[in-house]
Regions:
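Catalytic cores of DNA base-excision repair glycosylases
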Residues: 2-181
Length: 181
């Protein structure tokens, strides 16, 4: 059996077992999902979902985040860990989205990864969940499961992303990643 055949079997098995493939982060708009995803680094989605209601209530728009005092954001996101960097990045992201992208969260990897604190994992999540583009969100869970299934033989997130893009049907790639988590 080829890796591509194995990947298709995995897609079908996971689809049958987990028909609802959704992101566990709670967000009402693309920028909120971008913020929640940044907070999720080295933190559980459950913890992020406890923090974001107060954060989004205090800063309901991208402009509000852009004008926020980083120290105030730090206080709200403290329990997510790495709060100095995360707060700085969130305020920086808001400023960049406003000034460079006219208040619209970018829809491509290159522009997304140019934002403070946004790597390929976050960029792929936004491209897939917000814009419906084929995306592989190579987090630790997907990397571990893909290795166990024999789809990849690497722990490098970028290599996993590229290899899985070749194996997974584009229309299934984003959901496959959610189902693995």
């Amino acid at each position: 059996m080829t890796k591509k055949q194995r990947a298709l079997l995995a897609v079908e098995a996971l689809k049958k077992e987990y028909p609802e493939a959704i992101c566990s982060l709670v967000a009402d708009d693309p920028f909120q999902l971008l913020v929640a995803t940044r907070l999720s680094a080295q933190c559980t989605d459950a913890r992020v979902n406890l923090v974001t209601p107060a954060l989004f209530a205090k800063y309901p728009t991208i402009a509000a985040f852009a004008e926020a005092d980083v120290k105030d954001v730090e206080e709200l996101v403290h329990s997510c860990g790495f709060y100095h960097a995360k707060a700085r990045d969130i305020v920086g992201m808001a400023n960049e989205v406003l000034t460079r992208f006219g208040g619209v969260v970018p829809d491509n990897i290159e522009d997304l990864t140019s934002l403070p604190g946004v790597g390929r994992k976050t960029a792929n999540l936004i491209c897939g969940d917000v814009y419906g583009k084929p995306a592989v969100v190579a987090d630790t869970h997907l990397i571990r499961i893909s290795n166990r299934l024999g789809l990849v033989k690497t722990k490098d997130p970028y290599k996993v992303e590229i290899q899985l893009k070749k194996l997974l049907p584009p229309e299934e790639s984003n959901d496959f990643c959610h189902r693995c988590v």
